[in-house]
């Protein structure tokens, strides 16, 4: 690692962390825009929130501008179009259950004819403002709830009785849209994952007239979903196990591991297994995003010295040089030193200090590069669009998800497991009474 990076990164990161996370006021002259695709399942979820959002926007922010694209962007993480499509359907199904969105039990992508009919309806309608948003929500329901008969009827009426409308707040184009997102003051907010962040921003700038209540079962950082002692004992007795696939140069890996270890692992009796990955170039990250996540999750995150490929390899060497039962604590300490002390493991002095701190007498003789490649292969088999990748095993079931945005799923899954367990016990008792 260059001397400039080794010395300048900790200074720069400390300065950046001490700055206010939010710019006090963002310009409102461009209003608020949402980008959708009719064949995007996240757009379907987002459409169910838009009438309420429009209702509580101040007059300054109305009307909400809607851009409907018929062009998708390339899937992330080298996923195929089919893999991405299946991931989105599964993920949206989980989100819909967690946040009480309307959703079909067996969702399918709408067919081309239905999509064209839906676009025609929305292009032709003279409705505007909240009325248009309610219509758009209904059209999305017809597409994704397989209500093709209703869609054909509405399409026939729109085609016969109305002409194409041209309103400035309603745009149809071919802007590549991977999944639904809002745009405010040139900043992008993912339509589901960042909805609460957007609402906080709008509320901060007094651009809402009422309290925003969108994701009703959202789990805040460090607020446990399960607090009843009996329920907690039930989960702990199931011995949950969690695998983490992490890129060592990615600060999100530190934030996620630290949060889970400090807040969830002991509380729920989770066995954590760490699988470091080879260098993925994730040291070029969004500093403001990582800073914001650090403050939201209450995990320390400065000063740091971004690891290079050589530093990541050195971190993995230290990790695999400790006994298996000590590896979790070792990885926590390695990442803590890198992301809160500014240590550079590719620098011999720092490497030797880390080695002493971890009480490593003999470095491993394993081929570290080969070991990381094996972890890469197992991680790729999970077919996830982002890192870190998590696999939770409990009650003979396995659940795979990804990123810091989905950490809430751990507790949500526990809650669902308990619900199924109690349901099964009640059914068993009822059967015994009958006999």
Go through the PLM ranges and name each one.
Residues 1-25:
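Alpha-helical membrane-targeting segments
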Residues 35-40, 245-250:
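Aromatic-flanked redox-active Cys/Sec active sites in thiol-based oxidoreductases
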Residues 81-84, 88, 160, 249, ...:
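Residue-level preference for long, well-ordered alpha-helices that form the structural scaffold
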Residues 21-23, 61-66, 169-171, 231-233, ...:
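Short hydrophobic/aromatic-rich motifs at helix boundaries and adjacent loops
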Residues 22, 26-30, 68, 72, ...:
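Alpha-helical context
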Residues 38, 42-142, 254-341, 421-422, ...:
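Structural alpha/beta surface segment adjacent to cysteine/selenocysteine redox centers
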Residues 3-4, 11-12, 28-32, 43-55, ...:
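C-terminal cap of thioredoxin/glutaredoxin-like
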């Amino acid at each position: 690692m260059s001397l400039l990076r080794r010395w300048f990164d900790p200074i720069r990161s400390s300065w950046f962390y001490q700055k206010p996370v939010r710019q006090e006021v963002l310009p409102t002259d461009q209003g608020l825009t949402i980008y959708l695709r009719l064949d995007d399942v996240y757009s379907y979820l987002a459409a169910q929130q838009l009438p309420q959002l429009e209702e509580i926007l101040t007059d300054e922010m109305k009307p909400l501008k809607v851009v409907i694209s018929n062009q998708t962007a390339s899937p992330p993480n080298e996923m195929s179009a089919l893999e991405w499509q299946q991931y989105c359907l599964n993920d949206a199904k989980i989100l819909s259950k967690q946040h009480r969105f309307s959703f079909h039990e067996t969702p399918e992508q709408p067919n081309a004819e239905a999509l064209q009919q839906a676009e025609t309806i929305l292009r032709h309608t003279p409705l505007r403002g909240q009325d248009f948003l309610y219509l758009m929500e209904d059209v999305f329901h017809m597409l994704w709830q397989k209500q093709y008969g209703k869609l054909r009827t509405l399409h026939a009426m729109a085609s016969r009785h109305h002409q194409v409308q041209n309103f400035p707040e309603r745009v149809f184009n071919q802007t590549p849209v991977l999944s639904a997102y809002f745009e405010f003051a040139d900043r992008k907010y993912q339509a589901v994952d960042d909805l609460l962040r957007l609402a906080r921003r709008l509320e901060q700038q007094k651009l809402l007239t009422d309290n925003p209540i969108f994701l009703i079962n959202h789990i805040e950082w460090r607020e446990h979903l399960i607090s009843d002692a009996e329920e907690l004992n039930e989960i702990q007795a199931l011995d949950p196990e969690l695998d983490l696939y992490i890129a060592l140069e990615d600060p999100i890996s530190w934030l996620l591991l630290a949060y889970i270890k400090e807040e969830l692992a002991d509380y729920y009796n989770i066995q954590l297994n760490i699988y470091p990955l080879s260098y993925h170039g994730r040291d070029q990250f969004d500093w403001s995003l990582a800073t914001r996540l650090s403050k939201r999750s209450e995990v320390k995150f400065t000063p740091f010295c971004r690891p290079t490929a050589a530093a990541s390899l050195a971190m993995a060497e230290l990790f695999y040089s400790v006994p298996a039962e000590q590896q979790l604590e070792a990885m926590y300490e390695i990442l803590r030193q890198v992301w809160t002390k500014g240590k550079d493991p590719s620098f011999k002095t720092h490497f030797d200090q880390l080695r002493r701190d971890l009480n490593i007498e003999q470095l491993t003789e394993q081929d570290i590069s080969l070991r990381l490649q094996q972890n890469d292969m197992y991680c790729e088999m999970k077919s996830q669009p982002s890192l870190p990748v998590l696999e939770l095993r409990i009650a003979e079931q396995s659940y795979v998800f990804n990123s810091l945005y989905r950490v809430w799923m751990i507790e949500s899954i526990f809650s669902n497991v308990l619900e199924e367990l109690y349901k099964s016990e009640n059914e068993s008792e009822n059967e015994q009474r009958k006999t």
